[in-house]
From Swiss-Prot:
Belongs to the ATPase B chain family. F-type ATPases have 2 components, F(1) - the catalytic core - and F(0) - the membrane proton channel. F(1) has five subunits: alpha(3), beta(3), gamma(1), delta(1), epsilon(1). F(0) has three main subunits: a(1), b(2) and c(10-14). The alpha and beta chains form an alternating ring which encloses part of the gamma chain. F(1) is attached to F(0) by a central stalk formed by the gamma and epsilon chains, while a peripheral stalk is formed by the delta and b chains. F(1)F(0) ATP synthase produces ATP from ADP in the presence of a proton or sodium gradient. F-type ATPases consist of two structural domains, F(1) containing the extramembraneous catalytic core and F(0) containing the membrane proton channel, linked together by a central stalk and a peripheral stalk. During catalysis, ATP synthesis in the catalytic domain of F(1) is coupled via a rotary mechanism of the central stalk subunits to proton translocation. Pfam families: ATP-synt_B (PF00430). It comes from the Bacteria. Its main location: membrane. PANTHER family: ATP SYNTHASE SUBUNIT B, ATP SYNTHASE SUBUNIT B', CHLOROPLASTIC. This is ATP synthase subunit b 1. The chain crosses the membrane at residues 6-26. One of its GO terms (cellular component) is proton-transporting ATP synthase complex.
Length: 161
């Protein structure tokens, strides 16, 4: 049994482990593994912190987006109300403008009609005066004719004007 290769391998393994223990290989290996574990733990902590920050940023973005959408909807609704109000005002102003223009046109027409009637009356009076003066001057002569002519012309003018 002492000459079996398994025995010598086992003895060499034990001696190697003792030498490693004496040299501190196990301690340095454990230290390296501890450092690596600490580095991995720090990376995991950073990843967790970054994930939480990303979740906060996402929640903030969603809240701001919802707020912006509500504000946009309010702005659109206010713009529609304002547009309707402006359209109503414009319609009322246009109707008022048309009514005033119509009234102005009607008064100008009435004034033109009155002027035309006055012009026609004046022309008729002139024609009547001319006709009366022609008839009277042919039928009556002298001072009586002149007095009668002046009196009739003034009466005709008073009645026609």
């Amino acid at each position: 049994m002492f000459f079996d290769p398994e025995t010598w391998v086992a003895i060499a393994f034990v001696i190697l482990m003792v030498v490693f223990g004496y040299l501190g290989v196990f301690k340095s290996a454990m230290t390296a593994l501890d450092h690596r574990a600490a580095r991995i733990k720090a990376e995991l902590d950073d990843a967790t912190r970054l994930k939480q920050e990303a979740a906060k940023v996402l929640a903030d973005y969603k809240a701001r987006s919802a707020t912006a959408e509500r504000e946009a909807a309010d702005i659109i609704a206010n713009a529609k109300v304002e547009a309707e109000r402006i359209a109503t005002e414009a319609k009322a102003k246009m109707e008022d403008f048309v009514a005033r223009r119509t009234k102005t046109a009607e008064s100008k027409i009435a004034l033109a009609e009155a002027q035309a009637v006055a012009d026609v009356r004046a022309a008729a009076a002139e024609a009547a005066v001319q006709a009366a003066s022609t008839i009277l001057s042919q039928s009556v002569k002298g001072q009586v004719a002149d007095d009668l002519l002046a009196k009739s012309i003034s009466e005709v003018r008073q009645k026609l004007n």
